[in-house]
Amino acid sequence: MKLVALVVLAACGGSQPATTSGPAAPTRDQGLVAFETVRTVLQHPRCQNCHPSGDAPLQGDDSHPHQQNVQRGPEGRGMVGMECTTCHGPANPSSKYGEHIPPGSPDGWHMPGPDMKLVFVGKPPHELCEQIKDPARNGGKDLHALRVHLDSPLVAWGWDPGFGRAPVPVARQAFLDAWETWAKAGTPCP
């Protein structure tokens, strides 16, 4: 009789482990809300100043053209004799130096190269979204490579820009969480 009971239980699936699914993927609407947070960060002066439509970086909270006629150069690191790292060192200077001192980053100050400018300035949300997720227009990066880029010291600088500069208005973790939500929702564009 015990054998019959075991066979019946096995046939009913009683011996199968219960299956659990992980959290549901975010909806398209949740992805769109998350992208608005991403867009807010990317189009803040801390980010867009190095992602202009032209070949000269912008500077300041008002995104004015960079002084000294600084140019992108052949690799996005400035022109010969006027590379970005000529003035921008490996760290932010002490606040005791006052305002308007060139900020720094340990992975070297630079812009995207001229062949892949990745423009953030003036892009409507839909165009910005499509550009970001298109490897043909974003430096050849897939979503994973873009996410890795978000952890670079130069990107993180936006939240610690040094004395006299406004940081990105969205908390860094909130931005990263929004990026993940947008990605998991399938990178929908507005």
Predicted regions and their residues:
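Flanking scaffold residues of small Cys/His-coordinated metal-binding clusters
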Residues: 4, 42, 78-82
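N-terminal Sec signal peptide cleavage junction
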Residues: 12-14
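Electrostatic cytochrome c docking/interface patches
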Residues: 22-41, 57, 61-76
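The canonical Cys-X-X-Cys-His
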Residues: 45-54, 81-92
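Sec-dependent signal peptide recognition
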Residues: 1-7
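Short, solvent-exposed loop/turn and secondary-structure capping segments
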Residues: 51-52, 59-63, 96-100
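C-type cytochrome heme-c attachment and multiheme electron-transfer modules
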Residues: 36, 45, 92, 99-190
